Design a protein with these regions (language model features):
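GST-like fold's C-terminal all-alpha helical module
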Residues: 101-199
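GST-like domain detector, emphasizing the conserved glutathione-binding G-site
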Residues: 1-129, 133
C-alpha cells in the first residue's frame, strides 16, 4: 500500500496525514513534488486523471483519489477511534459539517488561491483577480459564520468528539492563513476551537 502525497502546506494531503496520525496508522508515502509538477506527469495521471494528490494505491494495485474517500477506506478497516461518527445522528452531523466546511470555506479559499495569489499566477496567468478579491470576503464571512455556530459551547465542530469534520476545517483554516487569509480577530469561538485542535499531536506532527 502506498500513499502518493505532498507535504505541508498542501491541504488535501494533510487531511489524510492527520487522519492516519489520529488512527496510529503508518502507510508508505511516495513524495510527489507539486512544485516540480510531478502530479501532472503522464505516469502519475494514470493513477489519477485529474493529476491531484493524495492518491492511495491499495495492496491489490487499485487507486483511490480524494482525501475523504481515502480516509473512509481506512475507516472501514480501522473503525476505532471513530472519525466519521459514533451513531447515526453523530455520523450525519460529521457529514453535514464536512460538506459545510468544503462548500462554505474551502471553495472560496480555493478561488483566492487560484485567482488572487501571485504564487499561482505562473500556472494560471489568466487569473480573475476581481473574483479572487470577492472570494476573500466570502471566505471571511464563512469564518465568521462558523464562529457563530461554535458559540453554543461545543468542543468540536460536529459535537462532543473530534472527527473528520475538524480535520477538514483545520486544514482549510491553516491553508487560508498560508495564503494570508487568517481568521478574523472578532472570531473568538473559532480561534479557541483552532487552538484546541492545533494542540493535538496529530496536527503538530503534520
Amino acid at each position: 500500500m502506498k500513499l502518493y502525497t505532498e507535504n505541508y502546506p498542501a491541504p488535501n494531503p494533510r487531511k489524510v496525514h492527520i487522519y492516519l496520525a489520529e488512527k496510529g496508522l503508518t502507510v508508505d508515502r511516495v513524495h510527489t513534488k507539486m512544485q516540480e509538477r510531478q502530479h501532472k506527469a503522464p505516469e502519475f495521471m494514470k493513477k489519477n486523471s485529474l493529476g491531484q494528490v493524495p492518491v492511495l494505491e491499495t495492496e491489490d494495485g487499485k487507486f483511490i483519489s480524494e482525501s475523504i474517500a481515502i480516509c473512509r477506506y481506512f475507516e472501514t478497516f480501522h473503525p476505532a477511534p471513530p472519525m466519521f461518527g459514533r451513531d447515526p445522528f453523530d455520523a450525519a452531523m460529521v457529514e453535514m459539517w464536512i460538506r459545510r466546511a468544503e462548500f462554505r470555506l474551502w471553495n472560496p479559499m480555493g478561488q483566492v488561491w487560484i485567482n488572487a495569489d501571485p504564487r499561482t499566477a505562473i500556472v494560471n496567468p489568466n487569473q480573475f483577480k476581481d473574483y479572487g478579491e470577492h472570494s476573500k470576503k466570502v471566505l471571511a464571512n464563512a469564518m465568521k459564520w462558523i464562529d457563530r455556530e461554535l458559540g453554543d459551547g461545543r468542543e468540536f465542530l460536529a459535537g462532543a468528539h473530534y472527527t473528520m469534520a475538524d480535520i477538514v476545517l483545520l486544514c482549510g483554516i491553516d491553508f487560508a492563513k498560508f495564503i494570508h487569509q487568517d481568521m478574523p480577530d472578532d472570531a473568538p469561538n473559532l480561534r479557541a476551537w483552532h487552538a484546541r485542535v492545533s494542540a493535538r499531536p496529530s496536527a503538530r506532527a503534520t
